């Protein structure tokens, strides 16, 4: 019997855009869905970009619940973008007490990704049982 639970990813999309302060951006967004049968918190994701041969070109960790508008992506530097996306508690959606079967949005941003990027992978790199769970 497979162990129940986990975090699944849904509605994952990618797009390229240009920021005046940070250059070209690869923006990956979607929903992290709590499949555990208890509330969770501090959902942390790892995004990896790969070339056509599967060689890793870069990786970034962010926390769910942090989203940037197109205006922010355009205005912020790469360091400011990363700082915004690494807020543990989530700035736009609370990354705490995420009920079973509920979801929380996420965003991963690679600044100036290599031209050889062919695919991306999203992995769960951390999650905690919510203090609010019984």
Regions found by a protein language model. Give the residues of each.
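Short structured motifs
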Residues: 11-16, 29, 89-94, 106-107
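Asparagine-centered strand-capping/turn motif at beta-strand->loop junctions
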Residues: 32-36
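A short beta-turn/strand-edge loop motif at beta-sheet boundaries
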Residues: 37-41, 116
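Short, solvent-exposed mixed-charge patches
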Residues: 132-134
């Amino acid at each position: 019997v497979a162990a129940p639970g986990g975090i699944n990813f849904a509605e994952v999309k990618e797009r390229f855009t240009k920021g005046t302060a940070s250059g070209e951006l690869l923006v990956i967004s979607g929903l992290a869905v709590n499949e555990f049968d208890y509330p969770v918190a501090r959902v942390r994701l790892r995004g990896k970009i790969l070339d056509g041969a599967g060689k890793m070109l870069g990786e970034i960790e962010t926390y769910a619940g942090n989203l940037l508008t197109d205006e922010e992506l355009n205005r912020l530097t790469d360091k400011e973008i990363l700082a915004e996306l690494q807020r543990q508690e989530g700035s736009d959606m609370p990354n705490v007490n995420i009920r079973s079967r509920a979801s929380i949005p996420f965003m991963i941003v690679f600044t100036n990704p290599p031209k050889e990027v062919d695919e991306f992978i999203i992995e769960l790199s951390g999650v905690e049982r919510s203090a609010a769970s019984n």
